[in-house]
Amino acid sequence: METYKGIQFFSNKGTVKNAFKKSNLGYEVMLDRKEDENFIYSNYEHVETQVEKDSKGMVVCKKYKNTYEILVEKVKEKRLGVLLVGIGGNNATTMLGGICANAKDLSYMNKCDLKRSNYLGSVFLSSNIRLGYNEKDKEHAYAPIYKLIDIYNPENIVYGGWDINNMNLKDCLVRNKVFDNEVIEKIKDDLDYVPLKSVYFKGNFIAGNQQRRVNNILYGKNKLEILEQVREQIRNFKKQNNLNELIVLWSGNTEKNIPHIPGVNDTFLNILHACKKNHESVSPSVIYALAAILENSPFINSSPQNTLVSAVVQLAQQKGIFIIGNDLKTGQTKIKNFLLDFYFGTGLKPKSIVSYNHLGNNDGKNLSSDLQFYSKKVSKSNLICDYVRANENLYVDDEKDTNVLVKKSIDYCEGDSLNEKGKVSADIEDDCTYVESLEKQKVNSEIVIKYVPYVGDDKKAIDEYISEIFMNGKNTIVLYNICQDSMLASPILIDLILLVELSQRVFFKPNQEKKTNEDEHLLNENIQIEDYKLSHTILKPKYSSFKNLDSVLFLSSLFCKSPFNSTVYKTRHSFFSQLESLWNFVRIISGLPIDAHIDLPYMI
């Protein structure tokens, strides 16, 4: 029988406050805002440019304004839980081990020095945001985000989760080989936890080399029955741990990508029928996403696959539940992200970006399979495509054949030396088509990932960037990056959890309302799937005149390789735009004006 008691790092610390605080900072920030014991109140006027093309091809720019009343709930006594899919994996155990070490304020010796636990790499817990300018001292003033607004303490969250393998988490710490032995010895008893039974379907969703890990799975007649079992697990965990809110986070293996299939995964009704019929396209991650949303729990996809199909998005939007994806932006892609900002921002023209990396953890093992690697490759490549579309003027001349010495031969022999009249085979046609597609790329982009067991979690990455510079010169930058993959990923998982929790406490009242779709509230609390009635609850708005953020939480784009777009907005891929968007969001909800980076009063 499964146990639903979660992991609680705060149980040995006595009474603790849910809002994150750091005791070694000897100051507080006093903000010019209205607040009481329950809420922070602020107002914000948003000004943006709306762009349209008229019938003559003219780009018309119009200024648009809207004012918002903002209501932010304080954390207070809320109990939050997080269920991780793939809880025994490197990322999940590293995140939990790090939070545990911080909760215990752990110090330990590595081979170089005495070290203390920290949250380095977390935007919410370690980075500083600009407050304004101190004219007297002629200094810009900065403070951590948690000094401006309540950020939930990750050490106070109740954790649990699923895994296809039943190994206890304290043994997973040893198997995954991320932490030093001294750290493992000091935290392993706090991670004494056996994962819940998980969902596993054959059909190449994950690599075949993972089959030998499978010994801890749910069984059912069809995928709808298994979906209902996962929902029951979520309810039981929430009830036994006395939780007010719960977040489900996919930290499992990369799955293969699933195509958009009309009639199957285009609407929530169709995908529920597809579950009943055991349709081959319904993956384990889709089961968890549907289960989380039906249980009114936000869902985070930290892996590359396209779990957030149209059906999942529609269900989330009709229920008003946050969804986040896809794939964590950790080392190589994060560097690529801000390097592309540098290239395009300074008028340079990237032409070739080749990325190679090898690693030896279970992520690398799973990605050694072609189907799973393809999901990763697509996720890593989306970044470049959006930058090129935003800077098409740099590539106009590339569409012309500027090299007059090279001409493509139209008249060629389809046979060979033995058969002059032969026909070109399908394999040759495919090969030619593939090569021609590479030759047509505005930026040649290639990604290679190899599994090398010996290196373990220490991923080695090599990147070569070639760009065109002034008067057709060339510039080449080569980077060699060695990083502990899971230690880069773990603070990003923490940030995604904290962002979702914060977003659930923020409400907006716009002066001008958007038009809503007529079918926005067609969802019933009882859904008939053939002979089965699926029941769920629909949350009512907390405050009648205030609204939550859209279900597709694109503020998370800073943390995701392939950030998901909503039905009305396409996310910007610029690293600094994403970072400033998140920081400005924090500013306006805490009562500060946005930082426009112009400092005009000091220019005049």
From Swiss-Prot:
<feature type="binding site">
    <location>
        <position position="327"/>
    </location>
    <ligand>
        <name>NAD(+)</name>
    </ligand>
</feature>
<comment type="pathway">
    <text>Polyol metabolism; myo-inositol biosynthesis; myo-inositol from D-glucose 6-phosphate: step 1/2.</text>
</comment>
<feature type="binding site">
    <location>
        <position position="485"/>
    </location>
    <ligand>
        <name>NAD(+)</name>
    </ligand>
</feature>
<keyword id="KW-0520">NAD</keyword>
<feature type="binding site">
    <location>
        <position position="89"/>
    </location>
    <ligand>
        <name>NAD(+)</name>
    </ligand>
</feature>
<feature type="binding site">
    <location>
        <position position="330"/>
    </location>
    <ligand>
        <name>NAD(+)</name>
    </ligand>
</feature>
<comment type="function">
    <text>Key enzyme in myo-inositol biosynthesis pathway that catalyzes the conversion of glucose 6-phosphate to 1-myo-inositol 1-phosphate in a NAD-dependent manner. Rate-limiting enzyme in the synthesis of all inositol-containing compounds. De novo-synthesized myo-inositol is essential for incorporation into GPI (glycosylphosphatidylinositol) glycolipids during intra-erythrocytic development.</text>
</comment>
<feature type="binding site">
    <location>
        <position position="486"/>
    </location>
    <ligand>
        <name>NAD(+)</name>
    </ligand>
</feature>
<feature type="binding site">
    <location>
        <position position="90"/>
    </location>
    <ligand>
        <name>NAD(+)</name>
    </ligand>
</feature>
<keyword id="KW-0594">Phospholipid biosynthesis</keyword>
<dbReference type="GO" id="GO:0006021">
    <property type="term" value="P:inositol biosynthetic process"/>
</dbReference>
<feature type="binding site">
    <location>
        <position position="361"/>
    </location>
    <ligand>
        <name>NAD(+)</name>
    </ligand>
</feature>
<feature type="binding site">
    <location>
        <position position="254"/>
    </location>
    <ligand>
        <name>NAD(+)</name>
    </ligand>
</feature>
<dbReference type="Pfam" id="PF01658">
    <property type="entry name" value="Inos-1-P_synth"/>
</dbReference>
<feature type="binding site">
    <location>
        <position position="376"/>
    </location>
    <ligand>
        <name>NAD(+)</name>
    </ligand>
</feature>
<dbReference type="GO" id="GO:0008654">
    <property type="term" value="P:phospholipid biosynthetic process"/>
</dbReference>
<feature type="binding site">
    <location>
        <position position="91"/>
    </location>
    <ligand>
        <name>NAD(+)</name>
    </ligand>
</feature>
<feature type="binding site">
    <location>
        <position position="88"/>
    </location>
    <ligand>
        <name>NAD(+)</name>
    </ligand>
</feature>
<comment type="similarity">
    <text>Belongs to the myo-inositol 1-phosphate synthase family.</text>
</comment>
<feature type="binding site">
    <location>
        <position position="363"/>
    </location>
    <ligand>
        <name>NAD(+)</name>
    </ligand>
</feature>
<feature type="binding site">
    <location>
        <position position="198"/>
    </location>
    <ligand>
        <name>NAD(+)</name>
    </ligand>
</feature>
<feature type="binding site">
    <location>
        <position position="210"/>
    </location>
    <ligand>
        <name>NAD(+)</name>
    </ligand>
</feature>
<protein>
    <recommendedName>
        <fullName>Inositol-3-phosphate synthase 1</fullName>
        <ecNumber>5.5.1.4</ecNumber>
    </recommendedName>
</protein>
<keyword id="KW-0444">Lipid biosynthesis</keyword>
<dbReference type="GO" id="GO:0005737">
    <property type="term" value="C:cytoplasm"/>
</dbReference>
<feature type="binding site">
    <location>
        <position position="328"/>
    </location>
    <ligand>
        <name>NAD(+)</name>
    </ligand>
</feature>
<feature type="binding site">
    <location>
        <position position="253"/>
    </location>
    <ligand>
        <name>NAD(+)</name>
    </ligand>
</feature>
<feature type="binding site">
    <location>
        <position position="362"/>
    </location>
    <ligand>
        <name>NAD(+)</name>
    </ligand>
</feature>
<feature type="binding site">
    <location>
        <position position="199"/>
    </location>
    <ligand>
        <name>NAD(+)</name>
    </ligand>
</feature>
<keyword id="KW-1208">Phospholipid metabolism</keyword>
<dbReference type="InterPro" id="IPR002587">
    <property type="entry name" value="Myo-inos-1-P_Synthase"/>
</dbReference>
<feature type="binding site">
    <location>
        <position position="457"/>
    </location>
    <ligand>
        <name>NAD(+)</name>
    </ligand>
</feature>
<dbReference type="GO" id="GO:0004512">
    <property type="term" value="F:inositol-3-phosphate synthase activity"/>
</dbReference>
<keyword id="KW-0413">Isomerase</keyword>
<feature type="binding site">
    <location>
        <position position="252"/>
    </location>
    <ligand>
        <name>NAD(+)</name>
    </ligand>
</feature>
<dbReference type="Pfam" id="PF07994">
    <property type="entry name" value="NAD_binding_5"/>
</dbReference>
<feature type="binding site">
    <location>
        <position position="213"/>
    </location>
    <ligand>
        <name>NAD(+)</name>
    </ligand>
</feature>
<keyword id="KW-0443">Lipid metabolism</keyword>
<feature type="binding site">
    <location>
        <position position="251"/>
    </location>
    <ligand>
        <name>NAD(+)</name>
    </ligand>
</feature>
<feature type="binding site">
    <location>
        <position position="303"/>
    </location>
    <ligand>
        <name>NAD(+)</name>
    </ligand>
</feature>
<dbReference type="InterPro" id="IPR013021">
    <property type="entry name" value="Myo-inos-1-P_Synthase_GAPDH"/>
</dbReference>
<feature type="binding site">
    <location>
        <position position="456"/>
    </location>
    <ligand>
        <name>NAD(+)</name>
    </ligand>
</feature>
